[in-house]
């Protein structure tokens, strides 16, 4: 059973509104080993959480079996924006946590999906633009993650100079590094 937590919509209440809630409910099933999570970026943001943290939490428990990557502007309705268009740093963190944990390489149910939205007002020829854009942003961020300087990160952590590390990440994302 793959649970995709969502804190609101369609009825503004949920028993499994967050990854933690879903895993707690899953722990009380007849066979908890058969319950995992599909973290959707926008749903974590709707709950006021960080999608990368939700993914890391589920990965630590071997319960992240799928992700739906998209973006969200605040705690409103589920906007299903293209991945990374609202918060590029947040998107980078998600790609980084998935890459660092070899998500998708374990041969089980792990899969990365791009959440789909129906834009009823756009022309037919652009109906897949949301997915094309999400995939492109994911690929660009994956390249940034692959060039991330982990030795520099370790030095910053050792020095407790997190502002220096933050600036490194921002310069990396802006193409300066």
Question: Which residues fall in each region the model found?
Answer:
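Histidine-acidic metal/acid-base catalytic patches
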Residues: 13-177
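Glycine/proline-rich, flexible active-site/cofactor-binding loop segments
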Residues: 1-9
């Amino acid at each position: 059973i793959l649970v995709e937590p969502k804190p609101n919509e369609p009825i503004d209440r949920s028993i499994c509104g967050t990854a933690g809630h879903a895993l707690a409910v899953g722990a009380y099933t007849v066979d908890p080993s058969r319950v995992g999570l599909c973290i959707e970026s926008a749903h974590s943001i709707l709950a006021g959480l960080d999608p990368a943290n939700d993914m890391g939490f589920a990965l630590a428990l071997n319960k992240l079996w799928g992700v739906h990557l998209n973006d969200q502007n605040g705690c409103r309705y589920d906007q299903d924006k293209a991945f990374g268009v609202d918060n590029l740093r947040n998107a980078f963190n998600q790609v980084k946590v998935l890459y660092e944990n070899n998500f998708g390489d374990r041969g089980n149910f792990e899969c990365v999906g791009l959440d789909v939205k129906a834009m009823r007002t756009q022309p037919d020829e652009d109906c897949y633009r949301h997915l094309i854009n999400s995939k492109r942003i994911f690929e660009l961020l994956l390249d940034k993650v692959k060039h991330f300087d982990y030795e520099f990160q370790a030095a910053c952590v050792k020095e407790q100079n997190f502002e220096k590390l933050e600036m490194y990440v921002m310069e990396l994302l802006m193409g300066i590094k």
